[in-house]
Amino acid sequence: MGEVYRLAEQKDAEQLLDITYRAYQLIRELGLHWPAANADLAMIEDNISINECYVLEVSGTIIATITLSKEEEVKKFSPLPFIKWFAVSPEYSNKGYGGKLLDWVEEHIILGQLGSPEVTLATAKKHPWLVEMYERRGYERFLELDPQNGDGIMYLLKKTLINKPHFIQRG
């Protein structure tokens, strides 16, 4: 299976809408007011136009997406690059593809192209596994806030992309 990492194009919008809607089912069930959870086609098209929306294709099919924001959502809290709208097609979840896309964006885009040694993202305290997943991937909480929209406590997390420990496998 060939893997391709690339910027999304407008022609990908319907496929991204389908993936994002299905991937964000739990977010809707938790009552979180995240734009990606209830995005329509116009919002997906705007996201592709305004931001840097990346996809992972396997054998020609988009299976995961993540967005490097060019908007101002967190600029008052941090000048660091902010990633959002991370989604993996449910039939491909828990197979490592989301992690591969996140690693690729961190290494090739955030560090490689932008030259930023750190990256940020946000998630909700009440989500049953996202905080822990990001922490296992090296993200650390650095800000806690309540947006007063019913979502409860939100965490802003950041990850240092340089000086990461390298693991050596011994044969």
Model-derived features: positions:
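C-terminal "cap" of GNAT-fold acetyltransferases
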Residues: 115-137, 143-171
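Short alpha-helical
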Residues: 11, 15, 62, 128-129
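Residue-level marker of the N-terminal boundary of ABC ATPase nucleotide-binding domains
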Residues: 2, 80, 131-133
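Non-catalytic, surface-exposed connector residues within folded enzymatic/regulatory domains
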Residues: 77, 95-96, 151
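Conserved Rossmann-like nucleotide-binding pocket used by diverse enzymes
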Residues: 4, 82-84, 120
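Acetyl-CoA-dependent GNAT
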Residues: 10, 21-91, 102-104, 108, ...
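Conserved glycine-rich acetyl-CoA-binding loop
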Residues: 89-103, 124-132, 136
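A short beta-loop-alpha structural element at the N-terminal edge
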Residues: 4-18
